[in-house]
Design a protein with these regions (language model features):
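A structured beta-alpha segment of the ubiquitous adenosine-cofactor-binding alpha/beta core
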Residues: 66-85
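Glycine- and charged-residue-rich phosphate/anionic-cofactor binding loop of Rossmann-like
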Residues: 39-42, 346-367, 387
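Predominantly a Rossmann-like dinucleotide-binding segment in NAD(P)-dependent oxidoreductases
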Residues: 137, 144-238, 292, 383
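N-terminal Rossmann-like dinucleotide-binding module
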Residues: 1-62
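Beta-strand-loop-alpha-helix segment that lines the small-molecule cofactor/substrate pocket
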Residues: 87, 93-145, 160
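C-terminal glycine/acidic-rich active-site capping loop/insertion
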Residues: 1-2, 11, 143, 245, ...
Length: 390
């Protein structure tokens, strides 16, 4: 169980690019990063509007002279300080991720980036090589995989409690884009523009969360081929999609279905995962993150609760509140940030053995998410044809 004791040598000097007053995810990053005393926010380029960013930064405790106008100024000026920033979080629109990440790595800074990581696998692989050459960590904020019961599911699968995996069924939907985009805010505009969002809308924005979580739970099976059907129900969003279904064939013979939509009218936002094996099934939803349904064929269904001693150690190790109290998304983000901090600390100490065994969403996870998106787009653009996953 996590109790807030600092698990690294000292707090990391941390900065942010984006995530300011008008951003949607900045607060999630800050509360996650600062929960366990592993990061100390020392600087930021929080906003395209430099004055607004400076005003925001000072109001969250950053010195005015370390609130910069853009990421280039941040990198240049922090490099000249003995107490300069060591790790930078990137909470900006998709099209900026590659340039900012590469610049930070070239300056010797670790990076924590929003997903989807970049536009192409080629960009991901280039940056992965750069990070390896520089001896730096790149983390990706797949923020839902810090929930303790996600790791309970992975442990149950690993122990064979489900038997052979047969069916993978996942959805992440909401209805907040069910209407047209007249009067829509900037967050909607950039997400539905291929120049700023990349080749997908909901597949990249929310579908990659499903894909990565399934990789955490089912690391031993891989997609062999897939079929993607995507559609823009609001025509102005085309060629990007606001709804998509992906069918997947796995190398062990399992079948998968993934549904993502931002036009599921009336739905406030929900993720659901069901993993079916030859012996039993498990089902988990982020709407009830403290509960995991475990169904064994021929037996009464069981509801497993977070923090209980009957759970696997992998789950209990990332629990924060204990069984008496609920855990939420903020706790999950805190775990992600903690695991990345521990990885940065290990990299700094040269502890490669720790890094080999330590789970965190890194650049390989980000790369595989982009690879999945590339295959989805290739299938959809071929008339929703089956394509080999490569």
């Amino acid at each position: 169980m996590i109790n807030g004791e600092r698990s690294i040598e000292r707090p990391l000097r941390w900065g942010m690019v984006g995530g300011g007053r008008t951003g949607q995810v900045g607060y999630k990053h800050r509360t996650g990063a600062q929960r366990d005393g592993t990061y100390r926010l020392v600087c930021g380029a929080f906003d395209l509007d430099a004055e607004r960013g400076r005003d925001f930064g000072t109001k969250i405790g950053v010195a005015a002279d370390r609130c910069y106008g853009d990421f280039k100024e941040l990198i240049a000026k922090e490099a000249g300080r003995e107490d300069g920033v060591e790790v930078v979080s990137i909470a900006t629109p998709n099209f900026t991720h590659y340039e900012i990440t590469k610049a930070c790595l070239e300056a010797g800074l670790h990076v924590i980036c929003e997903k989807p990581l970049f536009f192409t696998v080629a960009e991901c692989e280039e940056v992965a090589r750069l990070a390896e050459e520089k001896g730096l960590i790149v983390g990706v904020t797949y923020g839902f995989t810090g929930h303790p019961l996600v790791h309970q599911m992975a442990a149950m699968v690993k122990k064979g409690m489900l038997g052979d995996i047969r069916i993978v069924d996942m959805q992440y939907t909401h209805g907040f884009n069910a209407g047209d985009d007249v009067g829509a805010g900037e967050a909607v505009k950039w997400r539905t523009n291929p120049k700023t969002a990349g080749p997908t809308f909901v597949l990249g924005d929310i579908g990659t969360h499903l894909y990565y979580l399934s990789e955490v739970v089912l690391p031993h099976i891989k997609i062999e081929k897939l079929l993607c059907d995507r559609k823009a129900f609001i025509p102005t969003r085309a060629p990007l999609e606001d709804h998509a279904t992906v069918l997947m064939h796995y190398d062990n013979g399992a079948r998968g279905r993934l549904w993502v939509s931002s036009v599921n009218a009336g739905n406030m936002g929900s993720q659901r995962y069901r993993f079916v094996g030859s012996k039993a099934s498990i089902e988990w939803s982020d709407s009830h993150p403290d509960q995991l349904i475990y169904e064994v064929q021929g037996e009464p269904n069981r509801t497993l609760h977070h923090g209980m001693p009957y759970l696997e150690e992998e789950s209990l190790a990332c629990d924060r509140m204990g069984a008496l109290h609920t855990e939420g998304l903020g706790d999950s983000w805190a775990n992600i940030y903690l695991w990345i901090a521990q990885s940065i600390d290990a990299k700094r100490r040269g502890d490669e053995a720790f890094l080999r065994d330590h789970h965190y969403p890194g650049i390989q996870a980000g790369t595989e998410g982009v690879r999945w998106l590339e295959n989805c787009v290739r299938s959809a653009d071929a008339g929703s044809a089956w394509v080999e996953f490569n």
